[in-house]
């Protein structure tokens, strides 16, 4: 695979390297030679819009896979299943010790099977390429993958004597709802109703913890882990306080329904918060874990003394690199006389692990799919060959997809493993 990247006038964007990584992951070649060259050009600056490198990889490889299936007489779904990553699949080249990296999991075959059933692939492929006057319809399948999360960030929240849970979050709000969704994990673990959760986010002046960037397809994975770590810290402290007040050992108690209960007695979380202020130390944030980021230390120090403080770093193990996957099916109608084409049907099945917010995930899956349709159908990069000035800079020259361009029927689901 040899990829040449038109990079624009500034530093390398890195798309070429990622394209090779994604190709090695999605199609699992036993041996692969990969080269990439980034060229500086006198053209307008550009940056990643979505999935840099992954999109190029799919565009290069999927027509090759489709052509191979036709030449070999193999079903298009079957050829993808044969080459799909499974389990802790290997990817990319080896490191200095000769060890290749691997992913945490891959259930791409399951995504293909689920998508084929939803799309009625076996039924519809028989009618593919049959002519109806000057029109012909065809069906196709393709795979996509991209990095799905990072690790090692901090979670921070306080339960105050008013019984509410005040979450501090460094995540920005991109409109995908992950800004709040990740903290439902902590609320659920504490038995706290969502209407009693107050979230402060996106302004570093408000004493926020060290968080992942709001991009790179990582927020849900990265920050649910951090939220889980913080909630685990709060549960440990709440049980210790209950043992001090009510007697017994911390392991005698459980946290649920806004209470710490055990030995036939209980405390509300509001009472636990008041006691945390009285006890001080680690309970209210005057003593902090050594492993948290210095940025989090400053924020937690500023918030100390207000209630039961939960602060922790995600130190959970991870075996491999986290990636997400999608299997996509589409039906297209082409007018052979005038060359026009229409997308008639589209189904996407995502392998993303545990789904936190189904509706938001559906928006992501179908929204990114429409973005890809735009790249394929109407959005082109055109510039003046002499001066490097952008020419396709208006909607009628570089047209994003409208409701008239996308299929009337679009469905999605998740593997759910």
Where are the regions a protein language model picked out?
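Gly/Pro-rich active-site capping loops and adjacent beta-alpha segments
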Residues: 1-57, 132-417
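Short, cationic motifs built from Arg/Lys/His that form the positively charged side of catalytic pockets
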Residues: 48-50, 76-82
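ATP-dependent carboxylate activation and anion-phosphoryl transfer catalytic cores
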Residues: 70, 83, 340
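Noncatalytic alpha-helical scaffold of FAD-dependent oxidoreductases
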Residues: 71-73, 78, 191
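Accessory "access/gating" subregions that flank catalytic or transport cores
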Residues: 81-158, 397-400
